[in-house]
């Protein structure tokens, strides 16, 4: 574990160098919240409630989603992994007793610590300005379930990015795969609109996909869009997806290394 802790420390140092990049992202997220305020304000102009929730609850949901992206979201980990494979940097991990997944997850964790910490500053500003509009439920169980839900969400998001990065073993360019993944994740992950506004059949189907658990599920727990029995059942589904994606990541790594060695990597 010491080597992965060292990787975490190195990741913290390197990400602090790029802290202004994260700060700009945080500032852009504030701009997005302004657009959300305007667009959803117009949507609620003709109705006091949509999908069973009022404007204040919807605004709170989007603020929580924007915040969680900086704490558990994958930014460019897929491209970083792809670059290491293309440049042959992956070879150094084949000669050392280091688990590449654990190493990259340590770097991912470091990046989220830095980005999440920087997000707290604009978040405090937004909360100060919109505190009269924010409606977070006070039930203690939401925090108790929210923490493991966020942990599994981070693992799922990283695992998906990791798998896309490993596709470089077969494809020289993965940008098309990543763009497609981002489009699906934004839609089925609840970043564009709360998923419970979808038709009932589509919403039910989305609950069995991993994208649902990337952002919507933890945000729905924290903002009161799920009751406790539903949250507990979906926590089991989220855990299952985390295990499945870990298995897929392991399979891609094993098969990818065989191909890498076969072509003289």
What are these regions (language model features)?
Residues 1-265:
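Hydrophobic transmembrane alpha-helices and immediately adjacent juxtamembrane helices
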């Amino acid at each position: 574990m010491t080597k992965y802790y060292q990787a975490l420390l190195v990741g913290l140092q390197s990400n602090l160098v790029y802290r202004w990049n994260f700060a700009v992202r945080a500032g852009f997220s504030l701009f997005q919240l302004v657009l959300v305020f305007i667009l959803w304000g117009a949507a609620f102009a003709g109705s006091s409630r949509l999908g069973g929730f009022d404007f204040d609850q919807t605004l709170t949901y989007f603020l929580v989603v924007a915040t969680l992206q900086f704490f558990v979201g994958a930014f460019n980990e897929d491209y970083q992994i792809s670059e290491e494979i293309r440049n042959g940097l992956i070879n150094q991990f084949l000669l050392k007793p280091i688990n590449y997944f654990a190493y990259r997850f340590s770097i991912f964790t470091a990046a989220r610590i830095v980005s999440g910490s920087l997000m707290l500053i604009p978040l405090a500003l937004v909360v100060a300005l919109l505190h009269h509009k924010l409606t977070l439920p006070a039930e203690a169980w939401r925090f108790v379930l929210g923490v493991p839900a966020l942990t599994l969400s981070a693992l799922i998001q990283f695992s998906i990015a990791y798998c896309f990065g490993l596709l470089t073993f077969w494809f020289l360019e993965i940008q098309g795969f990543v763009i497609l993944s981002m489009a699906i994740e934004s839609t089925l992950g609840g970043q564009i609109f709360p998923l419970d506004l979808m038709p009932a059949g589509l919403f039910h189907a989305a609950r069995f996909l991993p994208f649902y658990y990337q952002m919507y599920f933890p945000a729905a727990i924290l903002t009161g869009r799920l009751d406790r029995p539903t949250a507990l059942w979906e926590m089991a589904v989220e855990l299952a997806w985390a295990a499945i994606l870990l298995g897929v990541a392991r399979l891609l790594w094993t098969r990818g290394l065989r191909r890498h060695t076969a072509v003289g990597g």
